């Protein structure tokens, strides 16, 4: 809400009356920025849990909204709240939000929360650049953040995303237009070429972040298969075409079962399968977030694992003796591909000898049976 007020205050600044500006600014400070300062410790009775070791969407969204609000009123705020807050949010976002991207580019929560997190990250850095001329190191605080667009490309199948964890079928919490922004900031035009034709592209940020001078096809010389090796995530994406809605697509994961901001499932070995325009093996997605203990913890005895959609039996994964996988699982993986890439044409027939594989040793997930 603070972000929305910030945009309205800034973009319509020349038409607001003095009283209107004062009222809007007062509301932003009282119901947004003051609470942000309290969350950072000014009020010891206020708990801002999202600021501490929260490498994910909450940190990105909260810091982004507070930063946008502070920047919008910085020149008018005589209370000092805006400048005080900027001294807190930027460094915190660099230490937390930016670190949600793993060493291989994966978003460490889930494919769905990539949307929330990267939108917050992009809005925050874009606002800093627009208002001050600098992002203060946010874009490069994590040296591999630029790889996260690749994560989004490969986790997108012909019918839907590889929607593991807390993520319902086609549940888009916002758009992927951060891809347009990252294409410019990281000089990776392929990200914008991928996003510009997606169904979620027509929304306001595309007007500001899309560079209409880019040309080409995102799939031109883009490998069909890609593997993400960070031990936290460990997953692979394999397909027969980038442009055929009837293409074969298989995505499979191993990875650790803790450290995903309590948005993961007990799902080492989980997979999805698309073919002939249909998802034949899919995901159940999120449960009811209001359910008792749903976000209690990712410990072995967590109430979260009592819910069918979160426990092992609710996944496309192996069940042994009816037991959940161990949260301490540390799978090892092997993978390979013959390395085909699609050319510039939308018509592509994968060679008959094309092959890709992803295997995982899941023994550590079943040490309890």
Residue ranges and their predicted role:
Residues 20-58, 190-202, 280-289, 293-312:
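Short, charged N-terminal helix-start/capping segments
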Residues 250-347:
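Catalytic core of carbohydrate-active enzymes
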Residues 109, 164-166, 320:
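Generic structural "secondary-structure junction" signal
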Residues 336-369:
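Long, amphipathic alpha-helical stalk/connector segments used for oligomerization, subunit docking
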Residues 49, 73, 113-279, 346-351, ...:
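Carbohydrate-active enzyme catalytic cores, enriched for enzymes
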Residues 9, 104, 161, 315-317:
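Generic secondary-structure boundary/loop-capping signal
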Residues 1-156:
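Aromatic-lined, polymer-binding surfaces characteristic
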């Amino acid at each position: 809400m603070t972000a929305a007020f910030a945009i309205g205050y800034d973009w319509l600044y020349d038409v607001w009356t003095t009283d209107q500006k004062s009222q809007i600014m007062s509301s932003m400070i009282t119901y947004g920025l003051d609470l942000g300062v309290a969350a950072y410790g000014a009020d010891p009775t206020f708990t801002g849990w999202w600021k501490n070791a929260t490498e994910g969407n909450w940190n990105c969204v909260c810091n982004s909204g507070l930063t946008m609000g502070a920047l919008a009123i910085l020149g008018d705020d005589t209370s000092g709240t805006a400048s005080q807050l900027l001294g807190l949010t930027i460094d915190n976002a660099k230490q937390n939000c930016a670190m949600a991207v793993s060493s291989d580019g994966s978003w460490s929560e889930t494919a769905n929360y990539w949307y929330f997190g990267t939108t917050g990250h992009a809005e925050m850095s874009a606002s800093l650049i627009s208002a001050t001329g600098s992002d203060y190191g946010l874009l490069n605080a994590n040296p591999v953040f630029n790889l996260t667009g690749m994560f989004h490309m490969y986790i997108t199948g012909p019918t839907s995303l590889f929607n593991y964890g807390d993520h319902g079928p086609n549940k888009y919490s916002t758009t992927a237009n951060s891809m347009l922004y990252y294409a410019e900031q990281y000089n990776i035009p392929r990200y914008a070429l991928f996003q510009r034709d997606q169904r979620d592209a027509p929304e306001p940020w595309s007007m500001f972040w899309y560079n209409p001078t880019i040309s080409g096809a995102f799939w031109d010389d883009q490998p069909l298969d890609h593997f993400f090796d960070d031990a936290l995530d460990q997953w692979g994406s394999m397909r027969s075409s980038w442009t055929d809605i009837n293409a074969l697509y298989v995505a499979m994961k191993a990875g650790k079962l803790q450290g995903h901001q309590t948005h993961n499932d007990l799902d080492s070995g989980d997979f999805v399968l698309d073919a002939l325009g249909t998802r034949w093996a899919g995901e159940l997605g999120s449960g009811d977030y209001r359910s008792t203990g749903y976000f209690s913890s990712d410990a072995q005895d967590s109430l979260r694992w009592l819910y069918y959609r979160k426990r092992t039996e609710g996944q496309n994964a192996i069940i042994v003796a009816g037991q959940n996988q161990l949260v301490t699982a540390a799978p090892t993986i092997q993978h390979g591909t013959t390395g085909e890439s699609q050319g510039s044409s939308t018509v592509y027939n994968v060679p008959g000898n094309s092959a890709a594989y992803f295997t995982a040793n899941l023994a550590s997930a079943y040490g309890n049976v």
